[in-house]
């Protein structure tokens, strides 16, 4: 299996070193193995609460994205809340009402229609695993996700902030609206943090 290609241009800033301390970020490095299973391949990005890494799952040969939370206790509760929501979403992937909605959404796309019974088409990221990693800066909650594509912000940057071609806007908008429909109508969850 080929590794997904993510270049250093996928993120132009770094999180700085000041938060690599007790209760802060874990200093993940390429080649590090987490949970005796996930081999870190490269950095995907970071946020205020965590860093994100591309990893190879040695159990099945698949690539995954791992979010490594800061170790401060305040962030642990947020991680538990996120996991609770993601697990609730996973239970609804094959909801009969949702599958019928997808048939309607993709009625003109025979390839998608054939996949509906076997593949999750929620347009919402899927949690694959979670664990605690004991690192030099504390205990870090880690969440393992399926690997997704680039962010909307990266697409905007690729077009030099001059607008995205309309056909691509249509595809992205449809995916976002399908994901929001799944969250709102099927899962009764309101997403309050949409951003590129």
Which role fits each region the language model picked out?
Residues 67-75, 90:
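Conserved protein-kinase N-lobe ATP-binding Lys motif
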Residues 99-141:
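Short beta-strand micro-motifs within the conserved protein kinase catalytic domain, predominantly
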